[in-house]
Design a protein with these regions (language model features):
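N-terminal signal-anchor/first transmembrane alpha helix
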Residues: 1-29, 107
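C-terminal transmembrane helix and the adjacent membrane-cytosol boundary/short C-terminal tail
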Residues: 2, 9, 161-176, 188, ...
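Interhelical loop and adjacent transmembrane-helix boundary motif
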Residues: 4-6, 38, 51-61, 217-264
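Short membrane-interfacial helix/loop motifs at transmembrane-helix boundaries
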Residues: 25-65, 131, 217, 221-222, ...
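Amphipathic cytosolic juxtamembrane alpha-helices at the membrane-cytosol interface
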Residues: 4-5, 78, 104-107, 141-143, ...
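Transmembrane alpha-helices
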Residues: 12-24, 115, 150-152, 156-169, ...
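Membrane-interfacial helix termini and adjacent extracytoplasmic/periplasmic loops
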Residues: 49, 122-149, 183, 219-223
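Transmembrane alpha-helix signature in integral membrane proteins
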Residues: 64-97
């Protein structure tokens, strides 16, 4: 009885919150993906798998395969992955640079990093049109990539910076005393200590980049539509909520699989470093 009370007191509120605002909405969306769009544009019975067939490119009778959605999904994955990679290349050294500064300068740099959050997201993305148009880069996939990198770079830098501040630099000195080169000492002693922040930064960057539709809609145009644009269009202009729900679950599945693979690889890497 005491254990039940302790559970209700500690985990009960969080469990109720997650159930009401995460599990239940996802369940509703999944049920919508199995329903039929009516003649008046509503969602109703009977249950059907037609929406899922359309998601994977098949018609109702599995006679024709048109992988347009899968091509858009693949484009979304590699664009989001490339944007995340750019955030890693730019943000990882930046986090170390900020951590190496004096306290006063560090606060100033962190403030400059956070200031864009105080400006409306749409205004910041529209500003890139003014920057890129004179160079003939708007609209284009490159413009979308630059916009994503700009938008999500702070989400990568902040968790990595938090990990860098906790690095024990005595391990680097010990590695160098044992004959390791500076590069080898950094890779063996510093990178594993910043791995939690690196994983968190990649997740916080890749997930919103994969599902975004604002950046690609403004900077990319119709030729660079991503899966987020497809979902937004189904729930908006097209009004096909059943099909949009199926697309949403496909996007969710890809995100979860990607996060699982990355976490598994990062965890395996951490175990190898400890060994």
């Amino acid at each position: 009885m005491l254990t039940l009370r302790r559970f209700l007191a500690t985990l009960g509120p969080g469990t109720v919150w997650l159930t009401l605002f995460l599990v239940l909405p996802l369940l509703i969306v999944f049920v919508y993906s199995l329903l039929t769009r009516t003649d008046v544009g509503q969602v109703g019975l009977p249950f059907t798998l037609e929406n899922w067939q359309r998601v994977f490119g098949y018609d109702a009778l599995f006679e024709e395969f048109v992988p347009d959605n899968l091509q858009v999904l693949w484009r979304s994955v590699w664009v989001a992955g490339l944007a995340t990679g750019l955030c890693v290349l730019l943000g990882y050294p930046l986090a170390f640079y900020i951590a190496a500064q004096s306290e006063r300068r560090r606060r100033l740099l962190l403030l400059l990093l956070i200031i864009p959050f105080w400006t409306n997201f749409l205004i910041r993305i529209y500003a890139w049109i003014i920057i890129l148009r004179p160079f003939g880069l708007f609209p284009s996939t490159l413009a979308v990539l630059l916009g994503m990198t700009y938008a999500y770079l702070p989400f990568f830098v902040l968790p990595v910076y938090a990990s860098v501040e906790k690095v024990d630099w005595r391990l680097v000195e010990a590695a160098e005393d044992l004959g390791a080169t500076p590069a080898r000492a950094f890779w063996a002693a510093v990178v594993p200590q910043t791995l939690p922040g690196l994983v968190a930064g990649v997740i916080l960057t890749f997930v919103p980049a994969l599902g975004t539709f604002v950046v690609s809609d403004i900077l990319g145009g119709a030729k660079t539509a991503l899966v987020g644009n497809l979902v937004q269009n189904q729930f908006g202009q097209s009004g096909d909520w059943a099909y949009g729900s199926a697309l949403s679950f496909l996007l969710l599945a890809v995100v979860l699989i990607g996060l699982w693979l990355y976490a598994r690889a990062a965890g395996q890497r951490g175990l190898e470093d400890l060994a």
